């Protein structure tokens, strides 16, 4: 059910972008299965990936149900989650670039997870009060999941940052790798005019101060420094992605595209 005053095309695009964030990061988390440094961590990252995949499914399903423009075609109603996950090309995905970056080492993965989950938790805490009842319900369910994701990443950043000389160095390098992409998290220019004013979408610009305060506290406790690096121009919300995105989609979409219409 959509909110009566929301622009349908804008609402569909908003749900789709949030779903793409979750879907792409779920794919990256899944790449750690059988590769994590501990068996317990293998399970933890698999569960985080499954949480994100669940969020992606509900958001993509909702985007497909909303009348409007999705992927350049009028009337997106009736598109399934599978259609949106597997049958769009790279330029049609609108996730932030941060989530698509190649995992790197474990410290780099935890740095990205900390940055993104802190943002996502703040986003969902606000979105659960959305004027759109479906978005509010999706966010309300996801808040507890994402709080765990943030806590898990926080514990590892503290452990690695304030651990050995090598772990500290790796953690600092992981932060420097992710940091050029965090600015895009707080870009609200892509959201359809009116959705924020109607209370449907969250104005992410208002989340940045709290996000930075949390990250500053964690990094200080971990004896790490906030990276002094320039921000990338971004563009993921408009379909402009890093080189890594094409490879990720090729792997994720291969089976579905190779056997269209197959039933398992």
Residue ranges of predicted features:
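Conserved alpha-helical segments that form or flank metal/cofactor-binding pockets of metalloenzymes
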Residues: 49-87, 154-157
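A contiguous pocket-lining binding segment that forms or flanks enzyme active sites
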Residues: 134-197
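Amphipathic, well-ordered alpha-helical segments in soluble domains
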Residues: 21-29, 55, 59, 116-123, ...
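Internal, conserved structured core segments that host functional sites
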Residues: 97-152
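Extended, helix-rich structural scaffolds rather than catalytic motifs
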Residues: 169-264
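Helix-loop segments that flank and shape redox-cofactor active sites
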Residues: 25-47, 120-135
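Alpha-helical scaffold segments that form or flank carboxylate-/histidine-based iron centers
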Residues: 10-15, 36-55, 109, 134-146
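Acidic/His metal-coordination segments adjacent to aromatic residues that form catalytic metal sites
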Residues: 1-14, 87-112, 163-164, 178-201
């Amino acid at each position: 059910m959509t909110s009566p005053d929301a622009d349908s095309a804008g609402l569909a695009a908003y749900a789709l972008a949030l779903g793409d964030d979750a879907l792409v990061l779920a794919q990256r988390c899944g790449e750690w299965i059988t590769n994590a440094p501990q068996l317990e961590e293998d399970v933890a990252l698999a569960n985080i990936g499954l949480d994100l995949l669940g969020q992606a499914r509900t958001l993509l399903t909702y985007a497909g149900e909303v009348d409007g423009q999705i992927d350049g075609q009028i009337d997106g109603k009736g598109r399934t989650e599978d259609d949106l996950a597997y049958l769009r090309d790279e330029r049609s995905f609108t996730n932030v670039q941060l989530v698509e970056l190649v995992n790197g080492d474990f410290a780099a993965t935890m740095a990205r997870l900390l940055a993104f989950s802190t943002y996502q938790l703040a986003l969902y805490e606000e979105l659960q009060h959305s004027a759109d009842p479906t978005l509010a319900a999706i966010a309300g369910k996801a808040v507890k999941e994402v709080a765990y994701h943030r806590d898990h990443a926080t514990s590892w950043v503290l452990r690695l940052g304030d651990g050995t000389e090598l772990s500290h160095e790796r953690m600092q390098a992981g932060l420097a790798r992710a940091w050029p992409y965090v600015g895009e998290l707080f870009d609200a220019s892509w959201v359809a005019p009116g959705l924020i004013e109607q209370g449907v979408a969250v104005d992410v610009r208002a989340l940045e101060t709290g996000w930075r305060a949390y990250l500053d506290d964690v990094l200080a406790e971990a004896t790490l420094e906030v990276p002094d690096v320039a921000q990338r121009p971004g563009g993921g919300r408009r379909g402009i992605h890093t080189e890594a995105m094409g490879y990720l989609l090729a792997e994720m979409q291969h089976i579905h595209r190779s056997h269209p219409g197959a039933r398992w």
